[in-house]
Design a protein with these regions (language model features):
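Short, acidic/polar
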Residues: 1-5, 60-70, 180-184
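Active-site beta->alpha loop and helix N-cap motifs at the rims of alpha/beta catalytic domains
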Residues: 24-93
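Catalytic alpha/beta core domains of metabolic enzymes, predominantly
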Residues: 76-199, 210-212
Length: 248
């Protein structure tokens, strides 16, 4: 919660939330989610948009993946639009049954899906769900490159994935690990929004660990300013993405 608050102070418009258990392992513990979100919302000066993951750890069942979103009503929630061999060691499963459940609940709760894309097939899965009405348009896509099992973090892959996104949708890009900086710069050049943070990359420079999420946010903000752009405020992000602000 404190990391999210400091990231907002550094310029983040949206914070993406995972929780861990007391041993530091990824968790779906609903009490941890409540504690984390309530601590963020307790900062009355903080108007950051909250995005809760639907994929907090491997092998979660449908209900425990959806429950934090249902109970805490974020403005966004991740919607990983397909399955893949994750890190060459397990299956990151997003069964069509689960995606139907998740998409239906997000519509009912008025929570915007953050459609995470790890390869081109996931874009076409999203287009299918747009046609069936499961995903309400205009959609928001998060292109994630460099995860082992997904598309590699090259500019060519980013340009290609951007080219097949449905017209009128918003998008953001990010690179995992060593691709973090190249994909951030390419995303800025292509007119996308940015995602940065320790979930994707723990290094600030080669061999130098990042101090915090806030440090990575501050660098992204500086790069935008060097390009003649400005980081969006939370309210500007709400307008850009078509979010419904939740008041508690």
């Amino acid at each position: 919660a404190e990391s999210a608050y400091q990231a907002w102070k550094a310029g983040a418009a949206i914070v993406h939330i995972h929780v861990r258990d007391d041993e530091g392992k990824p968790s779906y513990d609903i009490d941890k989610y409540h504690e984390t979100i309530e601590r963020i919302r307790a900062h009355k000066d903080c108007d950051v948009c909250i995005n809760i993951t639907s994929s907090g750890k491997e092998n979660g069942d449908d209900e425990e993946r959806i429950r934090p979103i249902r109970e805490l009503l974020p403005e966004l929630a991740s919607f990983d639009c397909g399955s893949l061999n994750w890190q060459h060691r397990s299956i990151f499963e997003n069964h069509p049954r689960f995606l139907e459940k998740l998409g239906t609940e997000l519509k009912e709760l008025n929570v915007k899906p953050e459609i995470e894309i790890f390869d081109a097939g996931m874009v076409y899965n999203a287009i299918h769900y747009m046609k069936t009405g499961l995903l309400k348009t205009p959609c928001h896509f998060q292109i994630v490159l460099g995860a082992a099992g997904g598309m590699t973090n090259t500019v060519e892959n980013l340009v290609y994935l951007k080219s097949i996104l449905p017209e009128g949708c918003t998008w953001a890009g990010c690179g995992i690990g060593s691709g973090h900086m190249p994909m951030m710069l390419a995303t800025i050049a292509l007119g996308g929004h940015l995602r940065v943070g320790l979930e994707d990359n723990v290094y600030y420079h080669r061999g130098v660990l990042a101090e915090s999420n806030a440090q990575l946010v501050a660098r992204a903000k500086r790069l935008l300013e060097e390009a003649g752009l400005q980081a969006a405020t939370p309210d500007e992000a709400r307008e850009i993405y078509g979010l419904t602000r939740k008041v508690f």
